[in-house]
């Protein structure tokens, strides 16, 4: 099961302030065009841009009429509750959808493998999360976030490229080129300190930038993803993602800890780096031993399509017969207003 369309949560804003999908005819209009990013670190920061992006995704991309289709929206496990109220307003008042449902990305990641209890460890473009889920409900007080994610790594990788190849004038590389190169050449080290100290262990290779230039990279390949495990490399005070995953397990009741540790689901495009699963497993097991939980053996689930696991889980959930009574309808919204989302959705 794969999505028909995958695009970044950004839009081009022409001079008359109407977002257009990247690649759409409006992108070619000359003058006064800027890229807007409606979502930052998993939180909506530009509702106008998001409305335009969704409208064009539905009408121009999927070629459907919003007023004819119910919509399931995923949101960040740490997103503020008022964000859901605003989503309801946007869907019912601006896009006039007949019904909607909202679920956090952690639950949908678990649903993608048919599970409703476990620990979701997400590493996407804007934010990372470790979220315990039990019986379909998220444990908000045991949810941890890290603002180092794929976009941060891409910016860091650009800096590494510029430093490694000062003669090639790489400052002007597009974000798309840097991101594509990051996905092709970077990997997670299983022994970062050892690899840094021993140049003989660097897996050196040449890569084409697409403009005819070639770069030869060594330590840059494994230094790029490392801030997910050591955020301090970029000046962030938070612990790395494996530590946050362990802290999430610590926060839940002892009676449920083993059960949730048996299903640690990895999701998001930033978990696709070669070596990511192995490093996460090593560090999570080490955390358990270090803090007196030697019997706790986390079992990681890493499906090949985990970069779109949230979409897969949402598609599976919305297709269930038992789910159809869980939609928030237009009539319900008109009677109770946007505050109803706090009662209807977890």
Swiss-Prot record:
Source organism of this protein record: Mus musculus
Cited InterPro entries: Actin, ATPase_NBD
UniProt protein name: Actin-like protein 10
Pfam entry (one): Actin
Family: Belongs to the actin family.
Domain of life: Eukaryota
